[in-house]
C-alpha cells in the first residue's frame, strides 16, 4: 500500500499540462503512421521478393502479378521487427521529451500492428496473414496457439508500457497513489491513444474502401490495459528538479510531413522496387 503523503499545495496543482497531453496525442498519431507504413513496406518488400510486382499506395499495397500468398505475412513480420528495433533505440535517450515520447508510441503501435493479426488469426479468413497462413497447410488447431501468442504479446506490450508512461511524470506526487497513476496514464496514454489515430486520418485519405480509416479508432484500445496496469505499478521513481513537460511542435511537424509525403508521393502508387525512369504507376 502506498504511504507517501501528498501535500495540499501539490494536490491542487494541475496534474498534467494540456499542452503535453496534446503533444502525446500527436506523438501517438505519428506512431500510427509509422507503424502502418512499415506494415505496408513489409508487404511490398515480401511481394517483390515473391515476384508479385507490388505497388505501394498511401493506404494499401496492391499486387499486379500472381504468386504465393506467403508474401502477405510480410506486413506483420516487418511490424514486429521494427518494433524490436525501435525498442532497442528507446533507452538510448535519457531525456523525457517529445522525441522520446514519439519513439515510445512508435514502439507500441508497431508491436500492436504486428501482434493483432496473430491474435485474430482464427477469426478471420480474408486478412493478409490468414491468407498467408492457409498456404502453409499446417494441422488444424495450430492457429489457436499462434492466436494465444499474439494475445499474450498484445497484453505484454500494454502492461509493460505503464511504467514507461509513468516515467514522464514531472514529480513523484503525481504518481504516488493508485488513483494518481491511473489519472496520469489516462491523460498521457489513454486519451492520446484514442485521439492520436484520429489525427492520423488525413494521411490515409481517401480511403478508397480499404477499411483502414474506419479501423483507426481501435488502434489505441490497448491503452485501457495500460491504465489498469498503472494502478499497481509502484517502481517508477521521478528525480528531483524534473522539468514539467508541455507543448512541443515536433510531433505535429512530423505528422504534417507524413501527410504531405503520403498525399503527393505514395498516393500516386510507388512501384516496388522503384524505377528511376518511371517510379510511379501513373508514369508508366
Region spans (language model):
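Alpha-helical transmembrane segments
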Residues: 24-35, 191-194, 254-255
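Hydrophobic alpha-helical transmembrane segments
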Residues: 72-87, 150-157
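An N-terminal structural lobe/cap that precedes and organizes the functional/catalytic core
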Residues: 16, 21-26
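N-terminal low-structure segments adjacent to metalloprotease catalytic domains
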Residues: 96-284
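Hydrophobic/aromatic-rich structural module bridging two neighboring secondary-structure elements via a short loop
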Residues: 78-80, 86-104
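Small-residue-rich helix-interface/hinge motifs
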Residues: 27-79
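Alpha-helical transmembrane segments and their lipid-water interface positions
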Residues: 43, 47, 82, 116-120
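Short, Lys/Arg-rich, polar N-terminal cytosolic tail immediately upstream
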Residues: 1-18
